[in-house]
């Protein structure tokens, strides 16, 4: 099935490498969080929601590994220790849920004060408009927290894109290369998996989605990782959203 022949009721989009450049995430968002995490924790250390995140971070298996790397770990957990651990997680590109939540709070300040604007490719808002006009829903599934997802689309370079989006999912529903995560999303959307089209740049995610019954297409945006020949043969590949701008709803309940 080619992109021009596809039909769906929901388009489920990844962010990094799909709607948004990988360089924005790695060269702007991650460094911003690293640079500001210590100041943020210092100023908000006593707040209940921050302390909940701190407690969750201490339960992460890598926390013990990080402390073992320190020449003189502090006797008590303080904001400097947690800030260092968060920087360690970012450097290791470990997608830990409480760290992602904390990043989202830090980025929120950056978006609010105008230091950050969410990058989206130029074909994204055009596709969003076309899909919604055709009656499709658009949902987001990213390893970044739901709060961070809303910030990128709510404070994008082209304005607020949130009105086009009907649902957001992060690692609270499961990891992105696990079949069950996509089964959970389909249930939460109350939609037949075959009527959900997942767009991503990661073959492992596309495979997990397809094993759950979803349709899946891989984006080959500039800067995305190169694909092996078997991966290219296994999935439909598109360079951007333009081939999908005429995506239509299924004609009836029997058509995928």
From Swiss-Prot:
Cofactors required: Mg(2+)
Keyword Transferase: no
Subunit: Monomer.
Protein name as it appears in the record: Enolase-phosphatase E1
Root EC class: hydrolase
Function: Bifunctional enzyme that catalyzes the enolization of 2,3-diketo-5-methylthiopentyl-1-phosphate (DK-MTP-1-P) into the intermediate 2-hydroxy-3-keto-5-methylthiopentenyl-1-phosphate (HK-MTPenyl-1-P), which is then dephosphorylated to form the acireductone 1,2-dihydroxy-3-keto-5-methylthiopentene (DHK-MTPene).
Superkingdom to which the source organism belongs: Eukaryota
Family the UniProt entry places it in: Belongs to the HAD-like hydrolase superfamily. MasA/MtnC family.
Co-factor note (free text): Binds 1 Mg(2+) ion per subunit.
GO MF annotation list: acireductone synthase activity; magnesium ion binding
Residues noted as binding substrate in the record, renumbered to the chain: 142-143, 176
Organism: Drosophila erecta (Fruit fly)
Chief place of localization: cytoplasm
This protein's UniProt keywords: Amino-acid biosynthesis, Cytoplasm, Hydrolase, Magnesium, Metal-binding, Methionine biosynthesis, Nucleus
SUPFAM superfamilies: HAD-like
InterPro entries assigned to the protein according to its UniProt record, in alphabetical order: Enolase-ppase_E1 (IPR023943), ENOPH1_eukaryotes (IPR027511), HAD-like_sf (IPR036412), HAD-SF_hydro_IA (IPR006439), HAD_sf (IPR023214)
Swiss-Prot/TrEMBL catalytic activity: 5-methylsulfanyl-2,3-dioxopentyl phosphate + H2O = 1,2-dihydroxy-5-(methylsulfanyl)pent-1-en-3-one + phosphate
Pathway(s) of this molecule: Amino-acid biosynthesis; L-methionine biosynthesis via salvage pathway; L-methionine from S-methyl-5-thio-alpha-D-ribose 1-phosphate: step 3/6; Amino-acid biosynthesis; L-methionine biosynthesis via salvage pathway; L-methionine from S-methyl-5-thio-alpha-D-ribose 1-phosphate: step 4/6
GO cellular component annotations of the record: cytoplasm; nucleus
Entry EC number(s): 3.1.3.77
Cystine pairs: none
One example of a Gene Ontology biological process annotation: L-methionine salvage from methylthioadenosine
Taxonomic lineage of the native organism: Eukaryota, Metazoa, Ecdysozoa, Arthropoda, Hexapoda
